[in-house]
Amino acid sequence: MSKVYIVAAKRTGIGTFLGSLTNVSAAELGAAVVKQIVTDVNLKPEHIDEVISGNVLPAGQGQGVGRQVVIKAGFPNSVVGYGVSMVCGSGMKAIMDGYLKIQAGWSNIIIAGGTESMSQAPYLIPYKTRIGAKMANFEVVDHMIYDALIDAYDGIHMGITAENIVSKHQISREEQDAFAIASQQKAIQAVDSGRFNDEVVPLEVKVGKEVILFDKDEYPNRKTSLEKLATLKPAFKKDGSVTAGNASGINDGAAYVMLVSEAALKQYNLTPLVEIVGVDQAAIDPKVMGLGPVTAIKNVLNRTHTDIKSLDLLELNEAFAAQSLGVIKELSEDLNVDKQWFLERTNVNGGAIALGHPVGASGARIVVTLIHEMKKRHSQQGLASLCIGGGMGTAIILKNV
């Protein structure tokens, strides 16, 4: 089987809900990143076998968001483009699928990642309107809440799954808020110091009557503090501890990588950034979906015969502070590694609590950020993982080249 390398990794800045990227569709966000990736590696688009796009909220976006990304990027009609939906894991699952296709010899060059415009998620009326009703009200459904943030089996919000982890592991409100403020501080430092500049594709976007250059993450909260976080009311449960301040955001953005085989690497004289060591996934009880990374990470460590302590950096998507702390607690116990070891190496430039969580893109976003940080620090190995609504997790291990 072929080794698989990543030769380019890019993303947009992450927009706030109804913020600067509101008027940019998911396909347009994805196309901008994909187009820049091909330019960066100086490769003709016709050499791309396919583009795989994670996307969770396609309603109202038009037929085939994945194919739209290809066409809007200006690629020839011969390049295949399609979508993948695995809720929060969609962007990483796209990368995993691309990796497995190249490893199996099916493809040589694939661009994979994810794109999401949560701001453009429409309101829906139920299918029964097609049948008609003699009387009574029709409910209007929020596509974004219903299809991305509500558990399909128990009808509970993702925030309640975080509260379930709080109960399981007795995680205090103070621990959650401290984790959240640390994420904010690291993210603000990274944005202000230009730490993300190499990975972000600048976009010209229209905001009101102005055209601005959108080239930085706009979600980090510069006005928050531990004191302010402590005043926030529980968001999902009357006596709970999960708040808007210690949970991830609702956001817009896109992130992609270019995957190539050994043969393509040599044929087109491409420079590798990292090699993919391995990938894996897991499924657990949907009611504690946030713990999905625990099993996924243990699976990929076992599959690749990797010692957890050989990892220099980790990107664990911060759906909720409680969820992140629950994952770290279980991993530290199961793998006999000190909790502080994880905290020192995880999300060194902040995570989704501060940067945001555009659901279809986040799995790819953490891979892109991990790659660039590994190159800056000359880290040998890194891991990215995230939880997935419905009770799943995905994980990927990368090796610096």
Model-predicted segments: where are they?
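Short, well-ordered amphipathic alpha-helical segments that serve as non-catalytic structural scaffolds
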Residues: 27-41, 65-69, 94-97, 158-165, ...
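Conserved beta-ketoacyl condensing-enzyme motif
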Residues: 22-89, 93-110, 114-133, 200-216, ...
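Active-site-proximal alpha-helical scaffold in enzymes
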Residues: 86-116, 166-195, 256-263, 328, ...
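Conserved catalytic cysteine-centered active-site region
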Residues: 55-109, 153-157, 223-249, 334-365, ...
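Active-site pocket-lining segment
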Residues: 161-163, 199, 207, 277-280, ...
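N-terminal extracellular/periplasmic Venus flytrap/periplasmic-binding protein-like
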Residues: 10-12, 23-32, 40, 175-267, ...
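Flexible glycine-/small-residue-enriched beta->alpha junction loops
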Residues: 109-164
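Condensing-enzyme catalytic core mediating Claisen C-C bond formation in acyl metabolism
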Residues: 1-24, 226-291, 295, 368-369, ...
